[in-house]
């Protein structure tokens, strides 16, 4: 059994800056907003949903079963199965892949999948289980430890990005130019209304008065492009990665509704896209930056599609050098990659991003009369995930 899988709805929340507009909304509540938005967009009764699969990376303090929380907060029945996925930055994409697999083999007919993260609310840890025998107790930043640090050599992810820049001879100037272009593309896309169809608002409760509705991304306006070339490197002494040519710390969620083509026909729902193929890849952890260049060819092969047949690509810009290196390795045209900007400007809530780039890709195909799209995202530990879709 290998049923055709279609995406019938795909949305994301606005992405909030670190300690910004969405900083008080938990990851699960952000996920709920995305799930509800995805279902409401197609007027789908939640009773039809068999399962919810959501990526979420740093789960400390979020509470038991974050995906289950998001499902219930979105108003789905208690009978809906819920699973949380942690594949670091690729979690949201892996959730979509697992949803597709469940539908392909007949385990489910309708699955909501995506990802969510509130990086502003990630706590600090202190080991007090056995007590501090003497002197002060040391606090550990959960965001740094569980989200942004290699588990094997304890280096920041940015150290690996600097290594990648050296290996592929990508200059500081190239990275800064890439970052500036990312910000400019995002600003143009927002000004042209190109994100209007994919973004659902989030109501943020206030201490007094009515909730504030957050409707737009924050980060792409929080930049002075003229200052980018003057910033210092932040990870290694002779490095080229800066705060501006890397993605930032953020809050947000994305959700997609997947179902079998037969079920979509039964419910009278028009597919947005078909899932053609997907794949994962792994290599040595310090080279996670180029793992998308290993995962994407595998996904294309499974989809029966050549690189040249792909109209548009979405690569998660964890760092500018990630986009540049993978385009270099794969020989891609920059005009076909992240045409509405990428994570450097649209930002990178860890568990959300893998799903977010699929949502954006669907809209890019629609806006630009494209047919085939491919998305790929690297993840800490040496991995990456990639997916190929075809506009319906």
Predicted regions and their residues:
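Condensing-enzyme catalytic core mediating Claisen C-C bond formation in acyl metabolism
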Residues: 1-26, 223-290, 294, 301, ...
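Conserved active-site "lid/cap" helical segment
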Residues: 1-62, 66-74, 81, 163-172, ...
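N-terminal extracellular/periplasmic Venus flytrap/periplasmic-binding protein-like
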Residues: 12-13, 24-33, 41, 174-262, ...
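Conserved catalytic cysteine-centered active-site region
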Residues: 56-110, 151-156, 222-248, 329-356, ...
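Active-site-proximal alpha-helical scaffold in enzymes
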Residues: 87-117, 165-194, 255-262, 327, ...
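Flexible glycine-/small-residue-enriched beta->alpha junction loops
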Residues: 110-163
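Active-site pocket-lining segment
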Residues: 159-162, 195-198, 206, 276-345
């Amino acid at each position: 059994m290998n049923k055709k899988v279609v995406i019938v709805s795909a949305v994301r929340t606005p992405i909030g800056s670190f300690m910004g507009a969405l900083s008080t909304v938990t990851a699960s509540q952000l996920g709920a907003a995305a799930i509800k938005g995805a279902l409401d967009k197609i007027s789908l009764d939640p009773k039809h949903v068999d399962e919810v699969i959501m990526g979420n990376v740093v789960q400390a303090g979020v509470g038991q079963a974050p995906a289950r929380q998001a499902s219930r907060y979105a108003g789905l029945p208690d009978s809906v199965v819920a699973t949380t996925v942690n594949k670091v930055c690729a979690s949201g994409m892996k959730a979509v892949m697992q949803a597709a697999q469940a539908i392909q083999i007949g385990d489910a007919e309708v699955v909501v999948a995506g990802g969510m993260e509130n990086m502003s609310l990630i706590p600090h840890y202190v080991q007090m289980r056995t007590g501090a025998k003497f002197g002060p107790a040391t606090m550990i930043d959960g965001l740094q430890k569980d989200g942004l640090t290699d588990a094997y050599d304890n280096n920041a992810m940015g150290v690996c990005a600097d290594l990648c820049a050296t290996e592929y001879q990508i200059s500081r100037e190239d990275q800064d130019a890439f970052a500036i272009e990312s910000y400019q593309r995002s600003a143009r896309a927002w000004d042209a209304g190109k994100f209007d169809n994919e973004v659902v608002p989030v109501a943020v409760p206030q201490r007094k008065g009515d909730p504030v509705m957050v409707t737009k991304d924050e980060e792409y306006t929080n930049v002075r492009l003229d200052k980018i070339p003057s910033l210092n490197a932040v990870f290694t002494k002779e490095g080229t990665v800066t705060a501006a040519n890397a993605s930032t710390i953020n809050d947000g969620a994305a959700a997609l509704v997947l179902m079998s083509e037969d079920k979509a026909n039964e419910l009278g729902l028009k597919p947005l896209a078909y899932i053609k193929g997907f794949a994962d890849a792994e290599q040595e952890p310090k080279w996670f930056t180029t793992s998308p260049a290993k995962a994407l060819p595998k996904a294309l092969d499974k989809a029966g599609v050549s690189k040249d047949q792909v109209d548009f690509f979405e690569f998660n810009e964890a760092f500018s050098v990630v986009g540049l290196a993978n385009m270099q390795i794969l020989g891609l045209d920059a005009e076909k990659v992240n045409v509405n900007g990428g994570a450097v400007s649209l930002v990178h809530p860890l568990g959300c991003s893998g799903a977010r780039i699929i949502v954006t890709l669907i809209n890019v195909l629609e806006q630009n009369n494209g047919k085939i799209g491919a998305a790929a995202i690297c993840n800490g530990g040496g991995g990456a995930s990639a997916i190929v879709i075809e506009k319906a």
